[in-house]
A protein has these predicted regions:
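Concave beta-strand-loop units of leucine-rich repeat
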Residues: 1-66, 73-89, 96-183, 189-217
Length: 217
């Protein structure tokens, strides 16, 4: 029998069936060979991790932690995924992880303190789904490698979508619900036709556009 998932190392990427759009985008931004540490329905203590510098991917699901204090020990982390952590309030420590390329946040309704986006200069993908306390997305326009932004069933409090307009690297914005007030979506599509903006139905459009671009190189 397999041992319990008590902070075990794994090489197989955990895929959330609830996060379909990230599944589709996986083929572009994810590396399933990353050395992964996963916690599920258990206590999380970063101080007890052996050889934390070797961990490249962290996945935490259904855990009752309230903050990510101590996570800075994972200095080579490239990907972090947080799912259904209903008591998590402070994720500001993510900003200490300078190697991060991919952040997936899913069903974190109690978050009040967020990380500073501009600090994560290696970020390629940033995804919010049902996450609380999003004051702003300002800073994404400063990220030179960011190609994917996910805004699903969230509200951005300052209602400022200009960072999307200003970004020079964004290719795809997953948009579900109304993260900004009307007519944000209409305006964005008008002013940035080069960015594919929309829900799951737009995945096919994005990949067709991507393939055409590659064929022309």
């Amino acid at each position: 029998t397999q041992p319990p998932l008590k902070g075990r190392l794994a090489t197989k990427h955990y895929r959330s069936t609830k996060n379909i759009y990230m599944e589709v985008f996986d083929q572009l931004i994810n590396d399933n060979k990353l050395k992964t540490l996963r916690y599920e329905k258990e206590g999380v203590d970063f101080a007890k991790i052996i050889n934390p510098e070797k961990i490249e991917c962290l996945e935490i699901a259904f855990c009752s932690l309230t903050s990510l204090f101590g996570i800075a020990c994972l200095s080579n982390l490239r990907r972090i995924s947080l799912y259904y952590c209903r008591f998590l309030q402070d994720i500001s420590s993510i900003g200490d992880l300078q190697m991060l390329e991919n952040i997936t946040l899913y069903s974190l309704p109690q978050v009040k303190k967020h990380f500073k986006i501009p600090e994560l200069i290696n970020l390629v993908a940033l995804s919010y789904t049902r996450v609380g306390g999003i004051e702003t997305i300002r800073g994404i326009e400063e990220l030179p490698k960011l190609i994917y932004l996910g805004l699903s069933q969230v509200k951005v409090k300052d209602n400022d979508y200009s960072p999307i307009l200003q970004s020079k690297s964004l290719e795809r914005v997953f948009w579900c619900g109304s993260p900004f007030k009307v007519p944000a979506l209409k305006e964005l599509r008008k002013l940035r036709p080069d960015i594919v903006i929309g829900g799951n139905l737009y995945n096919e459009i994005y990949f067709a556009k991507k393939n055409k671009s590659n064929d022309n190189k």
